[in-house]
């Protein structure tokens, strides 16, 4: 039996993976869900928990939960991005010389160890789904990954008993997933990857199956996580103005608030309004008060405007680096879960024309699907990358 190679999109907020079976991408699943939160809970005793189980721990034990480890993977302690991440991290992030460690209880964990817990969980789930031992993988990385990221993700994979056969830029993997390689066209492409923690723009020249990056630019602190943070701040601000209560002071309640904002954001991607409720969210005069609101999409979009402005700045900069105007771009592919936010799609369509902009129906899985397609080059009989057929809607 041929050894299975899996393709992994190790994301800031979520991780997903899959492999090729025939010409079909089969996805790794955790209780039928192919999108696995990149969240790790480190208990006082026992094994770590990864994914949705860890997410549920955020509300009760935020100081033992690590989110968005990708943001500091491979970075040195003096980096300004690290300082900003540490200020909002549940688990305490400290510097030891030029190294970073999470202090959780009486133990210390390097970011690579936390990342390895996620990769190890992916490997275990893949072995359960596909059978046999899995030890090899293709891993994607941000087009704007910091210098130390490559070595750090390789070390994390080794801890998780995985050998990385190929590191591929996320925009290239995304381009494969949306089928841009299915034509022999020669054209200029723009791939916009709006994920949970980063926004990357890549200008690419396509000649059939050959994709040549011309320019790449990104914002490492702009993603769905940041939209969630702004959402939570907006709700907390409204509460403070009306009742004088400071929701930031209760770490557990604010963690719950942020979680509920994330869930509401997802609903607003397909609806113009959504209910927002949170029981005993804050206290006034010693008495608990709940939040019961209807959130209109335009209301939160106005509060997200500075973030969208930053995204457009990234697009303008990558066009400048490539020496292109919007009219020079033949196709724009939107990938990453945050690209499903309607206002972002509207802004990009206004800039390039709606007919040239495509949004992957599996935007949150596009990069992992592309990575899975690339495993075709590493099987027992290497072959060309096929056009994507996905099992997103298939039963587990």
Give the location of each predicted region.
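Oxyanion-binding/catalytic loops of NTP- or PPi-dependent enzymes
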Residues: 1-87, 92-94, 108, 117, ...
